[in-house]
Regions:
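Juxtamembrane intracellular "pre-TM" segments in multi-pass secondary transporters
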Residues: 5-13, 197-227
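Extracytoplasmic
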Residues: 18-50, 241-246
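Extracellular/periplasmic helix-loop-helix junction of adjacent transmembrane segments
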Residues: 40-69
């Protein structure tokens, strides 16, 4: 693997096993920060005496809102100050957010901590991708990323169980203590073992003008924005599910203690479909796969809506699990393809453009999930409608983007 390595660092890169292990942990921070909190929702609502339990969804939304701004800053910052600087700065900010959230005496105070966490975790999320790209190219990079993604896919499956384990023996605040301990440990390991990969002669001065120029180019480019908005809406639908899943399982199916196991089963759909997408995309292409997945998502969402309406909004656990699993499979296919299709047209502003696309998608996802989440009424109907709307908008936007590309 070292033969295909493209080294820009002054020190030799880590061995493949250590490198994969380190960056699998770094990239897992986002998913861990979201999914580990789900079992704690009832305890958080009780601790802060929330009048409306739907407000616990904001624990997820505010984290993603913080990422909206973080993704916009850390991309250019990693090109200016280096990958290592951006990753470590992001981890420090994330740890500050953990401390604030852990010690918050009000729900609003905890949400401020979560927003800071989201801003900070954008550093490792964005800069780690650039660092991997610095050190590996071609088949070697594809192999490294596939191993990292395998681990990343497992995190949503085990994170709720981890959160459940912590609150079984301690306060929900200790989940933030776990985040803090884990991040500090990774930061120490990363600082000692990983060299900077962006040498000073290759760094680009931080420029508000450049960010503004790139933003205008992307925001007024219909094709790029169509893919970015679609990705945001679909992530918003996923956040809608994540934000309401604990309540659905508790309110409708009286499942509390074993909720993490059911959530893990559903999350495995993303892993299965991501694996299949890697096999199928070279044969059928991103557009065909994406449109097929969107149409399938619309079909399954319609089925969930019909089943829900026929059962007063409370379908049997079997039907809910089956249809939700199939929806997760569709979303797993869509995420990677939509991002790749947006990146295809970025050209010479790919680095900065990736940050703007990610930030735009995150903003759309927050707006979608917060609005849709307020309609939760102890039935699965709002969830079905949310997925159906996401699929409908996605089909229209992706089809329109491809038509525009064909006419260019």
């Amino acid at each position: 693997m070292n033969n295909t390595n493209n080294k820009t660092a002054s020190k030799p890169c880590l061995g493949p096993i250590e490198f994969i292990s380190m960056f699998a942990l770094i990239t897992s921070l986002v998913a861990l920060s979201i999914d580990s909190m789900l079992p704690a929702f009832p305890a958080i609502a009780q601790s802060f005496a929330l009048a409306d339990t739907k407000d616990t969804q904001l624990v997820i939304s505010t984290l993603v809102l913080g990422m909206v701004f973080g993704e916009l800053i850390f991309g250019p910052l990693s090109d200016t100050k280096g990958r290592k600087y951006a990753i470590l700065l992001g981890m420090v900010i994330f740890c500050i957010g953990c401390v604030i959230a852990m010690n918050a005496q009000t729900f609003e105070g905890m949400l401020i901590g979560r927003a800071i966490q989201g801003f900070g975790v954008s550093g490792p999320k964005i800069a780690s991708r650039a660092l991997i790209r610095d050190q590996y190219t071609g088949a070697a990079m594809a192999r490294i990323m596939s191993f990292i993604m395998m681990f990343f896919i497992l995190v949503p499956m085990i994170a709720p169980s981890l959160g459940q384990l912590i609150i079984t023996f301690a306060s929900w605040r200790m989940i933030f203590a776990f985040f803090l301990l884990m991040t500090v440990s990774i930061a120490i390991w990363f600082t000692i073992r990983q060299a900077e990969t962006l040498t000073k002669d290759k760094r680009i001065p931080f420029s508000i003008k450049a960010i503004s120029k790139a933003s205008k180019k992307i925001l007024f480019e219909p094709v790029i924005m169509a893919y970015a908005i679609t990705a945001g809406i679909l992530f918003g639908a996923l956040l809608l599910f994540i934000g309401t899943a604990q309540a659905i399982f508790q309110d409708i199916y009286a499942i509390v203690e074993h909720f993490p196991l059911y959530f893990a089963a559903l999350a495995s759909g993303v892993g299965v479909s991501s694996f299949l997408n890697g096999k199928l995309v070279m044969r059928y292409g991103m557009y065909k796969l994406s449109m097929s997945a969107l149409i399938a998502l619309g079909t399954f969402s319609s089925l969930l809506f019909i089943v829900s309406m026929l059962s007063d909004g409370q379908p049997s656990l079997f039907w809910f699990m089956l249809i939700s699993f199939l929806c997760f499979c569709c979303i797993g296919i869509l995420f990677g393809n939509l991002t790749a299709m947006a990146m295809e047209t970025l050209g010479d502003i790919a680095g900065l453009g990736a940050s703007i696309v990610a930030s735009s998608s995150s903003l759309v996802s927050v707006v979608f999930s917060v609005i849709a989440g307020r309609f939760y009424n102890q039935t699965t109907i709002p969830l079905a409608v949310g997925f159906l709307c996401a699929a409908g908008f996605g089909i229209y936007l992706v089809y329109s983007a491809e038509q525009r590309k064909a006419s260019m």
